[in-house]
Amino acid sequence: MGSRLSLDGSVRVVVVGGGFGGTAAASLLKSWAVPFVLVDVRDAFHHNVAALRAAVESGFAKKTFISYSVTFGDSFRQGKVVAIDPGRQQVVLSDGEELHYSHLILATGSDGPFPGKFNQVIDMESAIQTYEDMVKEIEKSQRILVVGGGAAGVEMAAEIKTEYPGKEIILIHSKTALADVELLPSVRQVVKEILLRKGVRLLLSEKVSDIENLRPNQFQKDMVVRTEKGTEVVVDMVVLCTGIKINSSAYAAAFGDKMASDGALKVNKHLQLEGYENIYAIGDCADLKEPKMAYHAGLHANVVVTNIINSLTQKPLKTYEPGSLTFLLSMGRNDGVGQVNGYYVGRLLVTIAKSRDLFVSKSWRTMGQTMPS
């Protein structure tokens, strides 16, 4: 990909959200010289696939935030989308600026608890410092409870135990099997074996009873945490890895009738929003029968940018079919397990492919910048 198209002045793609899908789409549009504006509420892309390690390993966080303006220049707007007017083909920002679009890509992503997701609207340097502060809290804590045993929870427990083998790590999960339900049973079993081998204590089929009263991510010696079954654990710190929520606020008013129950947008096989030929949804905010993953957002971006270009050049549109699942779990920098196109892959391949650098170098390449050492 990447040549110049002869376009008239009416073409302008607005991309709402600068996560994995939005930055991939913007980078592709840039390479094709298609006029675009990327809008995000923050000043930097967050490579949150590596966020858990940034919370554990000092000096790593600076590799996980990448400036938008350095990459996209005048094609980037920092701002919050407060309204979308599909009739006038406009996106309205909180400062009153109105961005006209010929095509709209909604890539608003999802939120979840820190450190897996970063929810504050602060500048890049302050964001990096927030992770460095978390590293210090973990260093002080001898006993750490990780709440939630999906992909984020098992990776978090493994990251801490790899960096600090002497700490007591307890993982609590409301179900009997760990990681995501879409994964092969063999993968989920190996996840459990890796954690046990590392010395993580597992409390399965248990739920924390007073989760809203906990103060997560802070050292607090000898906290007593109770489960609904009456189990008590005494810990110095709690880390929440308890699931995600779709960021729908930018589009809920305009497209409420096109939303699934979780807030994701209903799309057709071309990833077009139902009822619109020039509006697309990608990544976590697209209602697709597949796990919410950075890898999928990148695939969506490819399809959508191709479809925008094909629609401008009178070519047929590409379809997106969720395929057999590819899902790699990094269990610390020296271990991992997963599956590729539905087939099991073991420790060596996953460690080489993901666990060592968690794809951070790939994001710096996508953004055309040099990663800090």
Curated annotation (Swiss-Prot):
Q: Tell me where on the tree of life, at the top rank, the source sits.
A: Eukaryota
| Cofactor, free-text remark | Binds 6-hydroxy-FAD non-covalently.
Family of this protein: Belongs to the FAD-dependent oxidoreductase family.
Activity regulation reads: The modification by 4-hydroxy-2-nonenal (HNE) adduction in mitochondria results in loss of the oxidoreductase activity and activation of a novel function in mitochondrial oxidative stress signaling.
Q: Transmembrane segments in this chain: where?
A: 13-29
Q: Entry's SUPFAM superfamilies?
A: FAD/NAD(P)-binding domain
Q: In what way is this protein post-translationally modified?
A: N-myristoylation at Gly-2 mediates the recruitment to lipid droplets and plasma membrane.
Q: Which residues carry this modification: N6-acetyllysine?
A: K167
Cofactors, names only: 6-hydroxy-FAD
Reported function: A NAD(P)H-dependent oxidoreductase that acts as a key inhibitor of ferroptosis. At the plasma membrane, catalyzes reduction of coenzyme Q/ubiquinone-10 to ubiquinol-10, a lipophilic radical-trapping antioxidant that prevents lipid oxidative damage and consequently ferroptosis. Acts in parallel to GPX4 to suppress phospholipid peroxidation and ferroptosis. This anti-ferroptotic function is independent of cellular glutathione levels.
List lipidated residues, N-myristoyl glycine.
G2
Q: Which GO terms describe its molecular function?
A: electron-transferring-flavoprotein dehydrogenase activity; flavin adenine dinucleotide binding; oxidoreductase activity, acting on NAD(P)H, quinone or similar compound as acceptor
Which keywords are on file for this protein? Acetylation, Apoptosis, Cell membrane, Cytoplasm, FAD, Flavoprotein, Lipid droplet, Lipoprotein, Membrane, Mitochondrion, Myristate, Nucleus, Oxidoreductase, Transmembrane, Transmembrane helix, Ubl conjugation
**Gene Ontology BP annotations:** apoptotic mitochondrial changes; positive regulation of apoptotic process; vitamin K metabolic process
Database matches in InterPro entries: FAD/NAD-bd_sf (IPR036188), FAD/NAD-binding_dom (IPR023753)
Instruction: Name it.
Output: Ferroptosis suppressor protein 1
Chemical reaction(s) catalysed: ubiquinone-10 + NADH + H(+) = ubiquinol-10 + NAD(+); phylloquinone + NADH + H(+) = phylloquinol + NAD(+); menaquinone-4 + NADH + H(+) = menaquinol-4 + NAD(+); menadione + NADH + H(+) = menadiol + NAD(+)
